[in-house]
Design a protein with these regions (language model features):
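RNase H-like polynucleotidyl transferase catalytic core
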Residues: 164-170, 210-222
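Short, surface-exposed acidic/glycine-rich loop or hinge patches that mediate macromolecular interfaces
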Residues: 151, 170, 193-194, 218
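Short, surface-exposed amphipathic charged segments that create phosphate/polyanion-binding patches used
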Residues: 179-183, 222-236
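Non-catalytic accessory segments of DNA primases and related replication-initiation nucleases
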Residues: 1-83, 91, 103, 113, ...
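A charged alpha-helical hairpin associated with nucleic-acid processing machineries
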Residues: 99, 141-144, 215-219, 231-253
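Phosphate-handling DNA/RNA-contact segment within nucleic-acid enzymes
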Residues: 62-185, 199-200
Length: 253
């Protein structure tokens, strides 16, 4: 039996707490990476997340011990360069999954110039997939969803209990929009910048009838990730719960 949506939220809540203790200070992240390597993430709740693969720490030696050179699936996931270099070394890793929960690519995060590295997987297409597709195959699948741009935006909303999918960018597509049919209502939250505002004003995500875009005017808050840096999580949750009671196409919070 697969994980229920509530169990999934609990895992993401543990992941959220872990990541937010780091901030984006490179020295702090480096220390945490060393601690993870030395102590294998002591928290039992985070261990649960590791086991489910919703937030995973992988070292190259562990993968090499799996015989990745001979393993077709690992090669097709694009985990290693042709020279055998582990592409996501010293990064925190988020798996991209299909709606059955199969890992189809990995995204490695670290607060450097690159921020995110996605493995060149044979199974992955950003044009066709959201980050968070595994939610569609869960028990008690939610009847509504939020759509955001970034994977951290999604992580934070799911940690509060809100179902959410991430575009992994700004661009929508017919393939992604076909997923809307799984839900009764969709709430789009593009970033609070020039491009994001255009997405809302011109409906570039083609949200279905009865759905809404959510926005705010505070220019110091660019996205959901920023919102969590400026406000308490429970306050954000309360504001969003009030927002989803409204029926307007554009909802200001």
């Amino acid at each position: 039996m697969g994980m229920s949506y509530q169990e999934y939220v609990e895992v993401y809540n543990a992941v959220f707490r872990k990541i937010k203790t780091l901030g984006e200070n490179e020295d702090e992240v480096r220390r945490e990476i060393k601690r993870a390597r030395d102590y294998d993430l002591e928290s039992s709740v985070v261990d649960k997340a590791l086991n489910y693969g919703d937030f995973i720490w992988v070292e190259s030696e562990k993968l090499k011990g799996m015989g990745w050179e001979e393993n077709k699936k690992l090669r097709e996931l694009g985990l290693f360069s042709e020279a055998g270099r582990w592409l996501l070394e010293d990064r925190f890793i988020f798996p991209v999954k299909d709606m059955l929960g199969n890992v189809i690519a990995l995204i490695g995060w670290y607060p450097d110039d690159k921020k995110y590295i996605t493995t060149p997987s044979a199974y992955f297409s950003k044009k066709c997939l959201f980050f968070g597709m595994e939610m569609l195959g869960m028990q008690n699948r939610p009847k509504v969803t939020f759509i955001v741009e970034g994977i951290f935006d999604r992580l934070m909303l799911v940690a509060l209990g809100f179902p959410c999918l991430a575009e992994m960018g700004i661009t929508s597509s017919a393939e992604k929009e076909s997923i809307y049919g799984f839900f009764k209502r969709v709430y789009g939250i593009p970033d609070n910048d020039k491009v994001g505002r255009r997405v809302m004003n011109e409906d570039e995500w083609n949200l279905p009838r009865g759905s809404s875009y959510i926005f705010w005017e505070d220019s110091s808050v660019k996205d959901i990730d920023d919102m969590f840096k400026n406000y308490e999580p429970e306050s954000i949750k309360d504001v969003l719960l009030e927002a989803v009671k409204q029926k307007e196409r554009k909802i200001e919070i």
